[in-house]
């Protein structure tokens, strides 16, 4: 599994109504890409009204990581439209998914 999180101010933001819809959106995008034989996929960070950026980042990364574990190898780049979104996703990745934790 390969996941990169980058800053891309021109990235669109995916919108969802709630956390469950956000997770389902990422699962569907990843599964569809794998079925189509894709090896690389660029995704945009998602936002939902009323969900703080840290929670949105956690929902996003959990959905991506758990789905990637069930699929053939797929390199994913997650594009964040601003520093706040990038920081939320990077912090969540470092806390929950990074294999080597900083000291």
Where does each model-flagged region fall?
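N-terminal beta-strand/alpha-helix entry module and adjacent surface
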Residues: 1-20
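Phosphate/ribose-phosphate-bearing ligand recognition and processing surfaces
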Residues: 18-103
